[in-house]
Amino acid sequence: MARRGDTMSIVIIGGNDRMICQYKKICKKYNCKAKVFTQMIPKLGNQIGSPDIVILFTNTVSHQMAYCAVAEAERNNAEIIRCHTSSGNALNGILEKVCGL
């Protein structure tokens, strides 16, 4: 896990396609670097990398994506945060707790 003041690496799995730019903007506000995957892509596990945190928006993610993301997070000892809603406010709340800004 990154120390306070360092840039945290976050992967967001699920959510809405039209919100990708907003998710990244919100993460930037909390000094976090974000990768966002709203749809299943080939070799998703390789694309995830080794983030500090994986956020799963469970309402908008396929089971296949969720299983792949959780497996990669566990393999890299990343924290997994599950959230049912995929709104910007939900992401703000998660990052507020994690980053403490």
Q: What are these language model-derived features?
A:
Residues 13-15, 39, 85:
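Cofactor-binding loop segments of dinucleotide-utilizing enzymes, especially the Rossmann-like FAD-
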Residues 74-101:
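Ser/Thr/Gly-rich flexible loops in soluble cytosolic domains mediating phosphotransfer, phosphorylation
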Residues 8-31:
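Short, charged N-terminal beta->alpha structural module
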Residues 1-7:
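Short, Lys/Arg-enriched N-terminal segments with co-localized hydrophobic residues
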Residues 51:
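An anion/phosphate-binding loop that grips the pyrophosphate of nucleotide cofactors and donors
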Residues 32-47:
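A short, well-structured beta->alpha microelement
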Residues 59-60:
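Short glycine-/small-residue-rich Rossmann-like dinucleotide-binding loops
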